[in-house]
Amino acid sequence: MRRTVPRLVMLALAVGVLAAPALAQDKAKGAVITLQKGGEIRIEFFPADAPKTVENFVKLAGQGFYDGQFFHRVEPGFVVQAGDPQSKTLAPGDRRVGTGGPGYSIKAEFNKQKHERGVIAMARSQDPDSAGSQFYITLAAAPFLDGKYTVFGKVVSGMDVVEGIKVGDRIASIKLVN
């Protein structure tokens, strides 16, 4: 019995330490995207409108999936886009960048959120259920996208940073915030 109690305490502590990151991810209300060139973009999630999409983004960000990727698409007055893991190894301008993903796709969660300036949404191909890891942030309102792409959050600070993004600008990290 004397040996059992300390072992149970150690086991409980180990489980708590290992479970803490998962619990923190479950409670993430947003994220901070830090660029290598400097600047931060603070995002607030819409879990009530796109629960599986938020869950997927949180999982990928928590794994460091986006760290080191670059923004591969910049359309002035429209969007900036990132999330292709190939951008970690391929050069900006390589035609393959923009075609990659995490190796799976998630079901679309079209919702009532409008494509206003500063929303974050999932990029996809022609198939509505083809989104995986690529996301975009709108630089201006884009109502023609409403109901066609999954909006899962919005920029709450750092739009000046978003507006300064150029093709090739790298993500240093995406940290989850509660």
Region annotations inferred by a language model:
Residues 8-12:
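Small-residue packing motifs within transmembrane alpha-helices
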